[in-house]
């Protein structure tokens, strides 16, 4: 009778130990998503600051394009809001989708502004504007690959997490503690 009771206790300890280990693994993977997202946010802030500097440098010479500059500022603000939503939800699919939509909405005014600057190379040569514009454009160009690299890291973290919550027997823990799939960008 005593050995039967000890066997059950040992089995229970093994199951509880596995549950704790599986739960901690899922939490660690979910936290890796948050960390990877912070890398994207850091790159987005760099790009946003660079775009703001570019817009400020060309605001006067491109006064006729005030609508483009305004659209860029609004799209950037929406992107930052969406990025905060992803951070708070820890990569929930719906919030990631909103961010992807905001990123796509930013591309049009950003591309238009870049095209306007390329069509007017004198902007870079003019002393008051060119001195501010050249470093801001360089920072903007440098930010884009950083964002792509950070997105890849985020997607890798999401893939590892999603695989873990769908694999048997960890699937039981993910259902029990309501771990939800993460979204890719």
Residues of each region from the PLM?
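A helix-centric hydrophobic-segment signal that preferentially recognizes long
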Residues: 2-185
């Amino acid at each position: 009778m005593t050995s039967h009771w000890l066997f059950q206790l040992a089995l229970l300890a093994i199951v509880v130990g596995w549950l704790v280990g599986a739960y901690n693994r899922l939490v660690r993977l979910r936290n890796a998503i948050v960390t990877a997202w912070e890398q994207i946010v850091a790159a987005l802030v760099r790009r946003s600051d660079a775009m703001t500097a570019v817009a400020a440098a060309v605001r006067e010479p491109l006064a006729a394009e005030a609508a483009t500059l305004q659209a860029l500022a609004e799209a950037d603000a929406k992107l930052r809001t969406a990025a905060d939503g992803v951070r708070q939800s820890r990569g929930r699919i719906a919030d990631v989708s909103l961010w992807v939509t905001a990123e796509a909405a930013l591309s049009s005014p950003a591309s238009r502004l870049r095209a306007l600057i390329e069509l007017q190379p004198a902007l870079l040569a003019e002393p008051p504007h060119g001195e501010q514009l050249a470093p801001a454009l360089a920072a903007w160009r440098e930010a884009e690959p950083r964002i792509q690299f950070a997105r890849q890291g985020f997607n890798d973290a999401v893939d590892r997490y999603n695989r873990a919550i769908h694999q048997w027997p960890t699937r039981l823990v993910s259902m029990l503690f309501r771990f939800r799939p993460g979204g890719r960008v």
